[in-house]
């Protein structure tokens, strides 16, 4: 299955967010929407939740709303494709430093956890592998670096962390989005 809904361009979303006065980066918005989806929110309530969390409950203008609908659809499609196509939405290019990418990753993770927490209010009760991954994400959200660090080494470490975050998000999606099996009927033995 290929992604039918294409992700809007990072710089385009950045411009639309700035025009609307929304204090989030495209990476943070993608993290928030991804968190809502990975937390099991599959209905149309996601956009009003995003309004509440990012814009004091006010609806976005048409262009930004459409870009976010496209983003939501693209994320949903990539998650539904067994997650193979799901990627974090971070700034790229020669003009983007490794430090900018590290900051964007921390913002993505923070907002992913926000979206996940809104969808799954008892997030702190999650155990096993998913609970450990969520704890790791909380630590990654506080990601720090020393600007004197070797940038090539930091870039390699960052790529490993990005892949770990991607897999952790997929694990959350698998945990919270799968259908809970219904309990089989318990039959009481008939007394004769």
Curated annotation (Swiss-Prot):
Query: Where does the secretion signal sit in this chain?
Result: none
Sorted alphabetically, the Gene Ontology cellular component annotations on this record are: cytosol
- The lineage's top-level taxon is Bacteria
Instruction: Cite the InterPro entries for this sequence.
Output: YgfB-like, YgfB-like_sf
Q: Kindly give the Gene3D superfamilies that the UniProt entry links to this protein.
A: YgfB uncharacterised protein family UPF0149, PF03695
Q: Which SUPFAM superfamilies match?
A: YgfB-like
Q: Known Pfam families for this protein?
A: UPF0149 (PF03695)
Tell me the protein family, please.
Belongs to the UPF0149 family.
Q: Which NCBIfam families match?
A: PRK01736.1, ygfB_yecA
Q: Which HAMAP family match?
A: UPF0149
Instruction: Spell out the protein name for this chain.
Output: UPF0149 protein KPK_0755
Origin organism of this chain? Klebsiella pneumoniae (strain 342)
């Amino acid at each position: 299955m290929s992604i039918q809904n294409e992700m809007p361009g990072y710089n385009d979303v950045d411009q639309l967010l700035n025009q609307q006065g929304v204090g989030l980066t495209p990476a943070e918005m993608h993290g928030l929407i991804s968190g809502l989806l990975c937390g099991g929110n599959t209905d149309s309530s996601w956009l009003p939740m995003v309004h509440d969390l990012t814009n004091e409950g006010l609806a976005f203008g048409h262009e930004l709303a459409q870009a976010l609908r496209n983003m939501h659809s693209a994320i949903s499609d990539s998650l539904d494709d067994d997650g193979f196509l799901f990627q974090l939405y971070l700034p790229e290019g020669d003009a983007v430093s490794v430090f900018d990418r590290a900051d964007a990753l921390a913002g993505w993770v923070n907002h992913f956890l926000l979206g996940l927490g809104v969808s799954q209010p008892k997030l702190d009760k999650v155990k096993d592998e998913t609970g450990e991954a969520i704890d790791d994400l909380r630590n990654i959200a506080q990601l720090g670096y020393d600007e004197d660090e070797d940038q090539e080494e930091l870039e390699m470490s960052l790529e490993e962390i990005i892949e770990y975050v991607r897999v952790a998000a997929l694990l959350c999606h698998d945990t919270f989005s799968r259908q809970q099996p219904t309990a089989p009927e318990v039959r009481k033995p008939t007394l004769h």
